[in-house]
Amino acid sequence: STDVGAYHLVRILLENKRTTEAKLAARRAWVYIDMGYRIEKKFQKRYRKLLRKKDHIARLDRLLWKRRISASLRQLRRMTHDFQWLALARIALMRREPGVDYAVSKVPKHLIADPGLVYERVRWRRKKRLYDSAIKLLHQAPVPGAAAKKWWSERRILSRWLLRQDRADEAYRLSSTHRQTHGIGLAEGEWLS
């Protein structure tokens, strides 16, 4: 569905006193639908009482996984400082900005193992050719739930690098936890492991 359609669906549900359905529709739309600036502002203003903290967290996480940086930065206003630091660190890593170590150091301890942050740290290290450091971090990474294909991409690239370094055992350990269930990802994962 579209952002405008979701906005009007919630409005109609509320007008018809279907509050529970309106809450669910608003929360689902807020978390899963990309919204342009104007409709996002309108949606937030009109339906903010229907949204919970966890809806804002889930929206921010999804926007960051999709690399929707402008929308993520707008979302920061609705977040606690802890999640602001987390998002800013993820964005700094995505953009390969200077001072990423400082940005990561500002992330509170209880969020340092956030899968999105760990993923961006692995990716940043790989792109900076800090392969061994990226591999070490990847071995400590949480089981990929969200963005399994992105995680697999990093595992695949680093496994191939290990093979080129004649480190087949390490490549096997890294690729054997690919968690791909179909398609080319499964084929590559099984071949590498």
Annotate each predicted stretch with a short phrase:
Residues 1-193:
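Alpha-helical solenoid repeat scaffolds
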